[in-house]
A protein has these predicted regions:
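Helicase-primase coupling helices
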Residues: 325-378, 491-496, 507-509, 513, ...
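Glycine-rich phosphate-binding loops that contact phosphosugars or nucleotide phosphates
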Residues: 73-266, 343, 350
Length: 602
């Protein structure tokens, strides 16, 4: 349905939400909303009214501000934030918006990778800030002490089974001990009781703080902002250095709650922008699936990754869900183009000319310039998108709590890490085609005729030519850190293949971070994707301490295996050498894929 039919359907959807009191159910935590918002029978809806509850308490928010001041008074100037998914993506948003730079305060370094290169990059940044040259040979006690005496690592896990922060903390503790620094004074853990990370903290006697200020456990990781310490502590670290007055977090959350206006969503849902958005997504969806192409105002693009995690991890289940992309131009004459489940959303801050190609989401509060206003705007945006997500789940009867599919690859990775080399697990894979300096592992039903590039291109062509299965989008995933230049080069080629040659949107992801944010959807959400995962056979060695690429390799293999088991069209491309050495090989591969498709389209 489109045009006038869409308007009628959208109106009917808003009427349904009002008559069934969907927002009221969410707030009361009852009815179908309680069922959809529960994981293993346990309610995970503390986030719904969390912002209303916190300012009502006289001390909780001020305690977080005092924690921030105490970190400064203790001499901490650099804070490595180690976590995955919802435990860190909010911090990445705040970092990109300028709240973690450490200008006159504590610098925050997000760490969500098992690639030694990510640790090396943080070490280099801290050393550079101190004008401390890295030694070319073995590090000395004095060097490590100077480097780390004002550094703290915060290990965060809002799930029970995340192990990456444990590997980061283990690496850091080893270096602190070599430096003669007491680890307990430079560690902080925030996690759920009984989690893997909690067990680690207890064994190491590391200081810990509850994620929810009220010590509750009813907030899923992707709902961590703005009601848990994942948002509140970085915000407090920034605010208390700008101005030492108390009550700043209270003011930010109160303003965000005012912007959000959940009372309006309850009493008049047809007037609330995020309820309207949920209805529009539902109207655009086909068989429970919707592709959302999102255009943010200047300066706010950092929110897209957060929104993608929220939507895809929450709703990507049973072949349904919302898949989120940056706005990108699709060639309507391309053989794979279709638009009947796409919603182009343009977020605006004020009056703008009508554009029929976009659904317009008006958020005037994004125009604020002062730090308090911008933090409130970020928080209000988080709340609004969470509401849209829950209502879409309600309309399609999707359980939006939990992310069961990803436990498959986590268990596999755990086993693969015990091997001398996790790639041993795929060395005898039959659906393998080798080229010069690269090897492509394919699903078993793929015909292996020609080069790796031609094999991959033929699968894409088959999707758009036989008409039996639609191609909804392409995913490209780097396993491990990659240079900006290589990322941009690959992204340009990938967009050309998807947008121009085939007429479909594309994703460019970096793992393992994105395995904790959008892999749930790729494994169990809308099945109409083709995914290409890339792993270099060699990676940087750790500059300091002991940290190998074994976990990274295990994650690359385990996620691919899990996708294959799930029946998804997923390829693993192994490239000889390091990411830098393999950049040209990868570019050539993608150019050959593009050329093969163009020949087929002629």
């Amino acid at each position: 349905m489109r045009d006038s039919d869409d308007v009628l359907w959208n109106t009917a959807t808003l009427t349904r939400l009002l008559e069934e009191d969907a927002v009221g159910q969410l707030r009361r935590r009852d009815g179908k909303m309680a069922e959809l918002g529960s994981e293993n029978g346990v309610l995970k809806l503390d986030w719904v009214e969390g912002v209303a509850r916190l300012p009502a308490d006289n001390t909780l928010l001020e305690e977080v501000e005092e924690e921030a001041r105490e970190l400064w008074r203790s001499g901490i100037r650099h804070l490595i934030w180690a976590g995955m998914g919802g435990s860190i993506i909010t911090v990445r948003v705040l970092d990109e918006l300028g709240f973690c730079s450490g200008d006159q305060g504590i610098a925050i370094y997000p760490l969500d990778s098992t690639d030694p290169a990510a640790l090396n990059a943080i070490v280099r940044r801290i050393a550079q800030s101190k004008q401390l040259p890295l030694p070319s040979t073995d590090t000395t006690h004095a060097f490590l002490h100077t480097l780390f005496d004002d550094v703290m690592m915060v290990g965060v896990s809002m799930g029970m089974t995340s192990e990456e922060p444990i590997t980061h903390l283990t690496w850091f503790v080893e270096l602190l001990e070599q430096a003669g620094i007491t680890p307990a004074e430079h560690l902080l853990v925030m996690t759920l009781p009984g989690s893997y990370l909690d067990q680690f903290a207890r064994e190491r006697q590391a200081p810990s703080r509850p994620l929810q200020l009220d010590r509750g456990t009813g907030t899923g990781g992707r709902m961590s902002a703005p009601t848990t310490r994942v948002f509140l502590l970085p915000a407090a670290l920034y605010l208390t250095r700008e101005n030492d007055a108390t009550g700043q977090l209270r003011a930010v959350l109160s303003k965000a709650w005012q912007y959000y206006d959940l009372d309006l969503a309850t009493s008049a849902p047809d007037e609330h922008p995020f309820v309207q958005l949920a209805a529009a997504l539902y109207t655009a969806s086909v068989a429970g699936a919707c592709r959302l192409l999102l255009k943010m105002p200047e300066g706010w693009s950092a929110l897209v990754a957060w929104i993608a995690q929220l939507m895809e991890e929450s709703l990507g289940k049973g072949g349904e869900g919302v898949v989120v992309f940056d706005e990108q131009p699709l060639q309507p004459q391309a053989p794979g183009f279709y638009g009947d489940d796409i919603l182009h959303v343009r977020v605006v801050t004020g009056a703008t000319p009508q554009d029929d190609a976009f659904y317009t989401l008006s958020l005037p509060y994004l125009t604020g310039q002062e730090p308090h206003e911008r933090l409130a705007a970020v928080a209000a945006s988080f709340l609004g998108w969470q509401l849209s997500m829950a209502l879409y789940g309600y309309l399609h009867n999707i359980t939006f709590a939990g992310q069961p599919a990803v436990e498959n690859y986590k268990a596999r990775a755990r086993a693969l890490r015990a091997l001398p080399d996790p790639l041993q697990a795929v060395q005898d894979w039959q659906a393998t085609v080798a080229g010069e300096h690269l090897t492509l592992l394919a699903p078993t039903d793929v015909a292996l005729h020609g080069s790796p590039a031609s094999v991959f291109a033929s699968v894409l062509q088959q999707f758009v030519q036989d008409g039996q299965e639609r191609l909804g989008y392409l995913d490209f995933t780097f396993n491990g850190d990659v240079s900006r230049e290589a990322s941009q080069s690959v992204a340009a080629r990938w967009h050309h293949i998807g947008n121009e040659r085939l007429g479909v949107p594309v994703k460019v992801r970096v793992a393992p971070a994105d395995y904790h944010s959008t892999e749930q959807s790729e494994m169990d959400g809308p099945p109409y994707l083709v995914s290409l995962r890339v792993l270099s056979r060699e990676h940087e060695k750790s500059l300091l301490g002991t940290y190998s690429d074994t976990f990274l390799r295990a994650q690359a293999v385990s996620t691919w295996q899990a996708m294959i088991e799930q029946g998804r069209t997923c390829f693993l491309l192994l490239i000889d050498g390091s990411p830098g050495q393999g950049a040209h090989i990868l570019e050539t591969f993608l150019d050959e894929v593009s050329y093969s498709i163009s020949k087929s389209n002629q």
